[in-house]
């Protein structure tokens, strides 16, 4: 009985040691995160890099702005009116992140943590007619804001921290092994904990890859958003049509020139038979 009694605590101690070892391994493998926004030529765009074991595992370039509605008292101090705060993600933000095989995460904090953005990416495999196909997507966005912060909010009623979350989000869907690129603006609606308020997140100049980065600090092949592809087609279509029209004109002129030359070299046969004697 004594041996059995001693064996149970030993097993518990072993479990505790294993849990501590697992925790220490996670801490030692914790990724380093860099804010490289100063390298961007676009003052509104931020650049974030997450690295694990000296290798880039997540890269994100984008400009982000949040449209946040909030209530203030009307001049009669009886009615409420809704104002709007435009909050841009600024340079010099604090960044955290982690990479995983099927889940990656990016967190950004700015203005003394009055604002926080959390983006969760997932990689999934789907069974298609031609076989399994893997994609990644932005599956969740969370925005925490403090309406008592005076730079963007003016005399907000019930000022304090609020959390806005996406609902059943599936954005930036991209084939696995590729990066997502989109210069056009994209909007994502977030339901706020502030009653009956919806926060709008506006993304632009986006270039993101949260999985399968092969070269350090280098994006993989781009998967462009449909809006960019359509705009690119609209830009190149007039050029293509112009080239086709120019080619048609050149071919027409060449045919005319050849026809004219062949016609000029032909012997003109007189219609009047009396003129045959003058030939030869």
From Swiss-Prot:
The chain crosses the membrane at residues 236-256. Expressed in plasmocytoid dendritic cells. Expressed in suprabasal skin keratinocytes and squamous cells (at protein level). Expressed in the brain and weakly in spleen and skin. Expressed in plasmocytoid dendritic cells. GO terms for cellular component: cytoplasmic vesicle membrane; dendrite membrane; early endosome membrane; endoplasmic reticulum-Golgi intermediate compartment membrane; endosome membrane; GABA-ergic synapse; growth cone membrane; late endosome membrane. Changing residue 276 to A: Cell surface localization. It is found in: Cell membrane; Cytoplasmic vesicle, Secretory vesicle, Synaptic vesicle membrane; Endoplasmic reticulum-Golgi intermediate compartment membrane; Endosome membrane. It is a single-pass type I membrane protein. Pfam families: Lamp2-like_luminal (PF01299). Glycosylated. Residues 1-29 form the signal peptide. Keywords: Cell membrane, Cell projection, Cytoplasmic vesicle, Endosome, Glycoprotein, Membrane, Signal, Synapse, Transmembrane, Transmembrane helix. Residues 257-280 are cytoplasmic. It comes from the Eukaryota. Residues 30-235 are extracellular. Glycans are attached at residues 35, 53, 127. GO terms for biological process: establishment of protein localization to organelle; presynaptic modulation of chemical synaptic transmission. InterPro entries: Lamp2-like_luminal, Lysosome-assoc_membr_glycop. Induction: Up-regulated upon CpG dinucleotides activation. Down-regulated upon activation by Toll-like receptor (TLR) ligands. Appears to be a novel specific biomarker for blastic plasmocytoid dendritic cells neoplasia. Belongs to the LAMP family. Plays a role in short-term synaptic plasticity in a subset of GABAergic neurons in the brain. This is Lysosome-associated membrane glycoprotein 5. It comes from Homo sapiens.
């Amino acid at each position: 009985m004594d041996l059995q009694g001693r064996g149970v605590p030993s097993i518990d101690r072993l479990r505790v040691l294993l849990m501590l070892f697992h925790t220490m391994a996670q801490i030692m493998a914790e990724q380093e995160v860099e804010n490289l926004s100063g390298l961007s030529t676009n003052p509104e765009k931020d650049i974030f890099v997450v690295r694990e074991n000296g290798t880039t595992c997540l890269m994100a370039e984008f400009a982000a702005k949040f449209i946040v509605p909030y209530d203030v008292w009307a001049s009669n101090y009886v009615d409420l009116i809704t104002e709007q705060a435009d909050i841009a993600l600024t340079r010099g933000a604090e960044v955290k992140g982690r990479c995983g095989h099927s889940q990656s995460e990016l967190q950004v904090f700015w203005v003394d943590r009055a604002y926080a953005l959390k983006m969760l990416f997932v990689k999934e495999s789907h069974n298609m007619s031609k076989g399994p196909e893997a994609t990644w997507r932005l599956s969740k966005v969370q925005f925490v804001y403090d309406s008592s912060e005076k730079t963007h909010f003016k005399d907000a009623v019930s000022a304090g921290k609020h959390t806005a979350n996406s609902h059943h989000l599936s954005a930036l869907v991209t084939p696995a092994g590729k990066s997502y690129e989109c210069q056009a603006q994209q909007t994502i609606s977030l339901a706020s904990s502030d009653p009956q308020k919806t926060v709008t997140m506006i993304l632009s100049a986006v270039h993101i890859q949260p999985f399968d980065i092969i070269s350090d600090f280098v994006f993989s092949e781009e998967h462009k958003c449909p809006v960019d592809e359509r705009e690119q087609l609209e830009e190149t279509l007039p050029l293509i049509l112009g080239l086709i029209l120019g080619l048609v004109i050149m071919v027409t002129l060449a045919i005319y020139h050849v026809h004219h030359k062949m016609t000029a070299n032909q012997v003109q046969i007189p219609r009047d038979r009396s003129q045959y004697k003058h030939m030869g």
